[in-house]
Amino acid sequence: MKSLLFTLAVFMLLAQLVSGNWYVKKCLNDVGICKKKCKPEEMHVKNGWAMCGKQRDCCVPADRRANYPVFCVQTKTTRISTVTATTATTTLMMTTASMSSMAPTPVSPTG
């Protein structure tokens, strides 16, 4: 019985000390991750502090960038992210242009 209580106590203490991805705070509908500093290949999101707090940034990993709209993502000023920002702006312009071409056109009732 004593060994059972000792084992339970050890597991309860270890559960408090585990530093893994068990309690990672997510942002942007579980697309981004709250971190102190984003990696160069990750995208930094505008107003991420509202979801992650003032001391952390909301970072969108490179493999999940397609799941989040381009116009809400802002990059930090590094050489790699400047190219990404230019690509994102171009993609946004193309998306806006294609959406404006999808506007409904009036049809005359006679024909």
Curated annotation (Swiss-Prot):
Coiled coil: none annotated. Homodimer or homooligomer; disulfide-linked. Residues 21-63 are annotated as: In vitro binds to LPS, mediates antimicrobial activity and inhibits LPS-mediated inflammation. It is found in: Secreted. Keywords: Antibiotic, Antimicrobial, Cleavage on pair of basic residues, Defensin, Disulfide bond, Fertilization, Secreted, Signal. This is Beta-defensin 126. It comes from Homo sapiens. O-glycosylated; glycans contain alpha(2,3)-linked sialic acids. It is linked to May be involved in infertility. Homozygosity for frameshift truncating mutations are associated with reduced sperm O-linked glycan content, impaired sperm mobility and a reduced live birth rate. However, for one common mutation the change in sperm sialic acid levels has been challenged. One of its GO terms (biological process) is antimicrobial humoral immune response mediated by antimicrobial peptide. One of its GO terms (cellular component) is extracellular region. Belongs to the beta-defensin family. Residues 1-20 form the signal peptide. Disulfide bonds join C27-C58, C34-C52, C38-C59. Highly glycosylated atypical beta-defensin involved in several aspects of sperm function. Facilitates sperm transport in the female reproductive tract and contributes to sperm protection against immunodetection; both functions are probably implicating the negative surface charge provided by its O-linked oligosaccharides in the sperm glycocalyx. Involved in binding of sperm to oviductal epithelial cells to form a sperm reservoir until ovulation. High-level and epididymis-specific expression. Expression is down-regulated in infertile men.
